[in-house]
Structure formats: C-alpha cells, structure tokens
Amino acid sequence: MTRRLKEYALAAEIIGAIAVVISLIYVGVSVNQNTNAVMVANHQALVALDQATTDWFKDPDFAAAYIISLDDAGKLSAVQQAQFSSYLADKFNAWEFAFLTHESGMMEDNIWQGWDGHYRMLLQQSGGRWFWGEGREGFSPAFKSYLDSILATTE
C-alpha cells in the first residue's frame, strides 16, 4: 500500500509540474499580448494627439501665419506668435509623448522613426527653432537634451 501511495504521489507531482509549465506559458503569452495591445494604444493616442493639431489650419489667419513662420517666425505679430506657439506646444507635446513612449520600450522603432522624422521637420523650420528657444523649459530634461542634440547637428 505504501508503494502504491508513493506512485500516486509521484504521478501527482509530475502532473503538478506540467500544470505549472502550462500556466507559465499562458502567462507569457498573455503578457506578450498585453504589451502589444499597449503599444497599439500608444500609437493610437499619438495619432489622436497629432490629428487634433490639424484643426488649427481651418482658420485662414493661422494658416497664413504658419506660412510666414516657415521662413521667419520673427515676422509674426504678437497675436500670431501666441497662436503659433500654442500650435507648436501641441505638436511638441505629441513628439515628447512619442519620445518618452519609445524610450520606455512601448513604441516600436519603425513607428518611432516615422513620427520622429515628421516632427523633426517642424523643429528644423524657422518657426520650430523659434518656438524651441522660447518654450523648451516646458518639457522633460530627456526630451530637451534630445531636441538640443538634433539642433546641434543641423545648425
């Protein structure tokens, strides 16, 4: 009888070990799926942040100010500068979100490269450089360093 109990106990241990392995595989798959879902949600949030800035161009006066800012942001009136600064704050906040999301590993490199290239074009324009000189203190230290390094290589 004791031998039979030992055999049952051994079988129970083997079944228990198999159950633990299956549970760990399930947890691993679930974590991977959750990570993918978070990455997709982050990308969707960034798209929403960026699309919100297109409403600015429904205002013909702002669109005209934007065109002026491409060549020389210093030519903008005080009102235009305030509008343009608010617009770029929205754009740069979206860029910072993308940057921090990518740095934390929650955005794939190929997605980041597309967004980063899009926003770099703004920074390299006269208006983008003007805004960064005026508004950079409103951003995280890591993001400030990143943008400063971009400007250092393009000037």
Label every model-predicted segment.
Residues 7, 77-78, 126, 140:
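General structural signal for secondary-structure boundaries
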